[in-house]
Amino acid sequence: GTSALTRVLNLLGVDLGASLMKAAAGNETGFWEHQGVVDIHATLLGKLGMTWDDPRRLPDDYLNSDAARDAVTALVTLLRDDFAAKPLWGVKDPRMCRFVPLWREVFDALNARPGYVLLLRHPLEIVRSLHQRDHMTQSRGLLLWLRHMLEAEAASRGAARILLRYDDLM
């Protein structure tokens, strides 16, 4: 779902950068995720003692950690290098919804005005996909979906955002 949406945005003129994650089995047309952003998010989660599929809340004080400050610095540098001359750009990583407060700091440092696109898809479709790709249990998949959706909705309140139903996209 998010890969299809990101590709549509790309076809409409959103620059995704040159360092995109390679396609893989189960997503043969590509993930459309900036590899550098994915790597920085993975490093930050690791330093917080978490992984991409951890449904727990992030630590309340994570933004004040050295790991978060390092991530902000790395993201600002990466985005300046890749998108400085680009009028319209975007990045996608399903974990971004967990880090919106951190990304606000990145956008402030870049003097960028973010807009958010939240894709609404039936949770059981996502759980099925996670089970096929990662052998994730239904209960864990539902917890992860709920964590991502609640954090994305809450963190993007008051910001420029659009909510799009997956079925309407397809």
Feature-to-residue mapping (PLM):
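PAPS-dependent sulfotransferase catalytic core
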Residues: 1-73
